[in-house]
Amino acid sequence: MTGAPPYNPQSPTQQPRFPVYSPPNKNRSYYPNNDQYQQHPPQTPPAFAPQPSLSRSPHYSHAPSPLPATLPPLNGGAPPPGHHSEPSSQYQAHSSAGTPQFSLPRPYSASMMSSNGASPYNHSTSSHAHPSARLESLSQSPPKKETEPLYPIGGNGAPGYSSSMMREPRPASPPRETKHARAADPMSFASILSGPTEESSPKKQPSLPEALPAPATTITPPPPALAPVPARRRLTPPPVTHGLPPTSQLKVKEPEPISPAALPRLEKKPGAEKRRRNAEQEPKSAEALPVASANGAFEPTKAARVSNRKTLTERDAETINKIIAEIDNADKSDVESPGFEAEYDGYIVKSKKRALDAEKAEGIRRKRRRHDFLVKLGKTFEKQANAGVDRFRAANEASVIAEVQAKEIQDEKERKKDMQRKRRRENTVRLEMQKKLEAERKANKANDAAEKAKFLREAERAQRKIKSTKRALEGVTSPEEIGEVTPLAPNLEGGTTSSFHIGRSSPSRRKSGRSGTSRPKKSKEQKQAEKDAAEAAYAAMENDEPLPLAPKEDPRKETLKKEAKGARSKEPTPSPVSTFESKGYNQIYEQIWRDIARKDIPKVYRIKTLSLSTRQENLRKTAQLASKQSRKWQERTNKSMKDTQARAKRTMREMMSFWKRNEREERDLRRLAEKQEIESAKKAEAEREANRQKRKLNFLISQTELYSHFIGRKIKGAGADSSGDTAVDGSDETIQPGKADHTIDLPPSVADVGTKVTNFEDLDFDAEDETALRQAAMANAQNAVKEAQERARAFNAEENPMAALDEGELNFQNPTSLGDIEISQPKMLTAKLKEYQLKGLNWLVNLYEQGINGILADEMGLGKTIQSISVMAYLAEVHNIWGPFLVIAPASTLHNWQQEITKFVPDIKVLPYWGSAKDRKVLRKFWDRKHITYTKESEFHVLVTSYQLVVLDSQYFQKVKWQYMILDEAQAIKSSQSSRWKNLLGFHCRNRLLLTGTPIQNNMQELWALLHFIMPTLFDSHDEFSEWFSKDIESHAQSNTKLNEDQLRRLHMILKPFMLRRVKKHVQQELGDKVEKDVFCDLTYRQRAYYANLRNRVSIMDLIEKAAVGDEADSTTLMNLVMQFRKVCNHPDLFERAETKSPFSVGYFAETASFVREGQNVDVRYSTRNLIEYSLPRLLCSSSGRVDMAGPGNEQAGFRGKYLQHLMNIFTPENIKRSIDEDGGFSFLRFADTSINEAYEQSHLGVFERAVRRRGQSNRLSRLNVIYDDEEDEQTSKSVLPHSLFNIVQRNDRQAVRNVTVEGYMRDLMNVSEVTFEREGLDVIEPSASPAASAPPITISCSGQVALRETQDSFFNVSVRHALFSTPSRQMEQQILEKKLDPAPFSLPPMLPKPISTKGRYTHIEVPSMRRFVTDSGKLAKLDELLRELKAGGHRVLLYFQMTRMIDLMEEYLTYRNYKYCRLDGSTKLEDRRDTVADFQQRPEIFVFLLSTRAGGLGINLTAADTVIFYDSDWNPTIDSQAMDRAHRLGQTRQVTVYRLITRGTIEERIRKRALQKEEVQRVVISGGAAGGVDFNTRNRESRTKDIAMWLADDEQAELIEQKEKEALDRGEVFGAGKGGKKAAQKRKKDLTLDDMYHEGEGNFDDISAKPSGAATPVSTADNFGTPSSTPVPKRGRGRGTGKGSSKRAKTTTERLRLIDGDGGLES
């Protein structure tokens, strides 16, 4: 925002309604009321126009701005003077240019504008100024003070800047006329009665009429400065005063009297608003005022002429003068009160807003400038830092490299020495061990005690040697143990001998014998000097330089000689060897010499020989070098000089390669060392963190145990003792309903209540002392109990009627502790609770009283719903708490909840909250507000809704105070990061209850999400706790490790206060058993081909490596591969359906639009036409062109019909009868069994009609065609009527021999080929050949409607079609159905001959065989056998699938087998689910119920079925467990058998193995059992993607991969991570799990608008599997073949499937 005014120069709001002066020029428009624009800090405006909407109303002027109007000094100018008292004295001129961009000169220079009285800026008027000439009696505003202009004026009168909020500029207003005082005064009578000023053309300036001269005014300049007006005064309009103030210097002359003749004629006046508008819009002339030019001079302005007005009559003038006098004498109104205070306040608000916007914009620009400056400064510093680094590197790099190289060389030498020393010591240990064993063996065999003691001493000596050597190997420098030192003999004469130190070993005899060596020891410096000299000599030999031999008189030799002499002189004289005559000494002596002769002498000999050969080889090399050096001067030729450059280059290349290789090796070694250091540091840190986590875990578990101790113990039934339930015995205290004073107080804590620790960082978990941790845990537990009680009290305290009720019946202010509570079943509950359900009710009631939330985790089918309903009934019946209760359940169970509550507790009203947004809005009208008490007469008590709707309408649910919130299937909130979990956690409810049959589904984190939800104060921020559970328990299930029993016990102690779980087999004895069976199936030939082709197209090793890198695209590809393999296992038709085959049809086919508008029955016309058509003229097809059809143009046809068919027709009945009577031509009819009427009718029928009539007549002489020799000949002959023997027609009916008879052996003998064809079943097999093409018959084409109608009547003749195909018409079928008639009498055999092939019928269209459809899948073939057995046994089946596409295929199979079924999946509507389940439960004829595991596995009761079949198992075993418990639940009296179809040797076996591991996790955590019976030696949890890749491999490949991974681990590498490159550094996005891909659209069973899953979309593999499997797949990346590789853009489902199926890259 720039501080320029928001209005354009021509805005009418910038002008007063009654101007005081006229502008001096068209291009310079000054406005007397512009001081309000000075409130914004002036800045350079942008060059664009403002919005047109910023224009103000033209009818009202606005109050001046109270804000200061000063400009900041430019270029160090002086600050502006203080604000003056009259705000209207400061003006701001606007430029008339479009986008003025002028520089700002110094604003306070006096040379820019003159301050004389002629300047228009020196006119002083108020915000509602009046003309300068007026009556004395009128009120007037205070005079203006002359002020200096604040803005410089440009050459055209515009200021030096323009507003960024201006509109498009327009020409300035023309100069205005100066009228008479009465004409200019809006309140004067003349102004009221005068007509509107006539408008002139834009170019001509109007002038005053001559009869009205302009009044002369004298303006006296005011004093130059006045005191500034306070801000409070400037904020209000100036006060109204009557008369002129005493300080006014303005002198106004009285107007001259106006003659009556000069007055205008009285005419009809317009309205006040119109007059005011006209007065504002009309140009007015004024006196010639000076106009400032470009150089500051002033030019007078000429007054323009105006047209003369009409004069009034004398009578009119007298009337006007009289009225004027009355008006002048009347009381004047307060003209200074404009009545626009609201506009003024609005303007003030807008001005402040503009100032704030300007400040905000300036702040943004200031931040941007500061940011740019800091960026530039940072770049400068960075450049200087880099330069300094380069200078330092250039100065010190060489020395550092040399130092590092020298250090590395020295370290390598020391390492080699250490290794040699280590090997020698290990060899010594091994030899001494052998000696020790040998000595012990001899000692055991020795009979003499002395000899045995000798051997034992040798063994002891060897043992000491071994210990000392091992100590040296381990680098231990501690002194020998006291037991290893030989004890000193006591000195009886005076203590012990003190000349030997106990901590020092005795000197060796062998060493003392060698003490007299002639060779002196060399110091380390001497050895290094000799090495340096040797290296220098070798370097000189290599460079062909003379050896730097020491001179003969070298002082070093003299020094060495002196040192040797001094050493010899210092050697002590050896003492004479004393001889010993003992036998042991002699044996040791002889043994020493034998060892020397056998070992040391050959060793020394070898050393000497090797030294001699080395010396000779060195001398030989030296001689060769010397001879070469001596011959060099002879071999120097021109050729050798030319080769110098080549040799130098080769040498340089070799040196470069050597140093590169050397640097690479050094770098690798350095990296390896750094890696080892980092790993060791990580290991140490991991150990420290493990100890810390252990203490933190101990703290958290202790805290929860204390909480459990404080709130009491959970109720436990007698039948649950054997189930391993975590419940313990309760206390003896019970709740006594009706006694308000009965309370049970908790014991006081020994810890300080005020020491609650909410931040774990404040606790020192590294300290060894755990006293502080125990105290903090106890304090936190007690605070948690206290907070739960206070929260319950606070909730009850807000309900005033409820509090009064509590005082009479039950005191909720002092909740009791948890114990054995004997609560009877509520009377309003119509059902009878079982024993364990009643105990569950007791537990839930006590949780409610304590204000504690809980998890009811009974196994599915034990009645969690009825227990929850009984709690609500108990609260309503005993404590008169009628709600509101909130029940949230999956969408598929909403109707079940509504029905159960209405059925079991009719007194409780249920509000079903679901439907569209409009319906839910209507339902919310029934909600009571939060402060209204719910009673029995309330609109509703329980609201039932779904998880999805709760999230959508969470803002409405959060406004209601819920007494009890029940979450059914609580695993829906297992993720603490989901919006569903967060929204539900924010609901205002007294208690929460979670119902779930599977508290643990995939990992322990989901259990902790539920614990967080029910107790957020106790289980807050326990990430380490959750990680501990996931790491220890799941690794226990995977690696078969031993879980700490104490930790498991304490885990169960944590779950005890919050979770109650019972198992069916312990609490429900009458419930039938559940038997699970795994049915293994084999792959068929087609499935094996698909499976092998898929596996050959992918490399398992590449998948493992990509999985190790962690690329998101590769992980998605891997998941897609798993899906394709599972499709192959289910059915190969999921990839490619068998196609319907037919010959190529050559013809035209009609096209139609969508069939959606057609309704149920679609009338398909015969529209197929041949490409060849025979065109006929319209004349031939019409009646006029037909000879036999009568018409207006065909008289011959009428003649024929009249004479040939009637008058001259011989087949008339009269003629036939006369002929028969006279034995004429028709006398044969008596031998043809034909009457006269039949002969007449047949004469008028065609061939087809006569054939149809003969179809129903039986041949009574057919038995005469065959000779029978059995006993029935007599009966047969009797069946033939005597008069039929003379029937000449039937007797002479000649026909083929094969058609003589239709039954018996004769028929078989006459039709051998046909009978054989039928008996062999050749007519029911698929035809092996079919024609390549077919075409409809050639038709006649005519453009007339008559021909088309006849063609349609012929083709679609109902009677003809019925006779040929024996298909009744639609009307006949409808009548048969309506009247419920037997269709047999109305259906005759067709007249068409029987087709040769029953499969092909009369066409050559081949439909895929359903038998082959069944046998193509191993699973489906096994299922077919299983269903046949189950159907015969009277069982009913629940059939679960993972893919909705497979359900579609299964529907075709069940239709083929004529099994009645019903279907429920994710696409089934909510209202249809209830009806489908009810049909299956009530109709026993329905054999199979097809369900998807996710949609049909929750909340529905299907106890009518006793068999569950999983066609393909889910990834999560809990989902399958929930699905099978749809049948195995309360109400099931039969044994439930569960069949699981698993394809042997495929990915499904490994998926099942993984599911067993998850089940083991649940069993360990919930029941506390130990792992066993299942092999959990699988891969680690961190490599989940690698595990999935391992599923695709067979056993041999898996073994090979594990072996390679083990080898890589031994080398210290990560298997498959070497080829990762930069991909390893990429962060993974949100994982697209296999569950999401499989159950897309159907997994969310509470989603009403779920669509069928698209994961099982069939993929065309006609081209995929035709490619040879050995074709290598081109790899992606640079330098890896010609394959482009797929891009990293987001791919569609089709592209991903193509990429998986091997269609190559996705080249466009």
Curated annotation (Swiss-Prot):
UniProt GO cellular component terms: chromosome, centromeric region; chromosome, telomeric region; Ino80 complex
Region named Disordered: 1-312, 410-584, 626-648, 718-750, 1643-1708
Motif residue range(s): DEAQ box: 968-971
Domain Helicase C-terminal, chain residue ranges per copy: 1422-1582
Entries under Gene3D superfamilies matching the protein: P-loop containing nucleotide triphosphate hydrolases, Tandem AAA-ATPase domain
Chain residues that bind ATP: 858-865
InterPro entries for the chain: DBINO, DEXQc_INO80, Helicase_ATP-bd, Helicase_C-like, INO80/SWR1_helicase, P-loop_NTPase, SNF2-like_sf, SNF2/RAD54-like_C
DBINO domain residues: 592-717
Comp. bias regions, Basic residues: 507-522, 1675-1691
Start and end residues of each Helicase ATP-binding domain: 845-1017
Location relative to the cell: Nucleus
Cited function: ATPase component of the INO80 complex which remodels chromatin by shifting nucleosomes and is involved in DNA repair.
Domain notes: The DBINO region is involved in binding to DNA.
Listed name of the protein: Chromatin-remodeling ATPase INO80
Organism field: Neosartorya fischeri (strain ATCC 1020 / DSM 3700 / CBS 544.65 / FGSC A1164 / JCM 1740 / NRRL 181 / WB 181)
